């Protein structure tokens, strides 16, 4: 989870923003998580080409929860690369997130209620279970291919990817 970081004085009091993530660099931070390049000064590694199987956190194992228009590019990116996007809202903003859902920019919309037992909580837990099942099936499939001395077929992996 990225948001911001503060510079603290010797007494442990926050005295100045050290890092903030705004609408213009949110997608960059999603790529940083994807590639495992968390050093914000390391743009070279971030922009280097990297094979998908070397990426630390695949998009298919990401859930992006956003609450505003500044999150739409990341939500769209999540959906494009196989992750999940959830828009949360205050009741007065429901129409806007309904539009995101109807245009395929998000997978789900929920009130911004993060408490245990809410529809948002249940759905996030179900998505995580789905991700775990897909990973388990892909590992079993790859193990069986290894047992017969072969590599998985190119299309085989897609059978277990989230859509």
What are these regions (language model features)?
Residues 1-163:
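C-terminal cap/substrate-recognition subdomain and adjoining C-terminal extension
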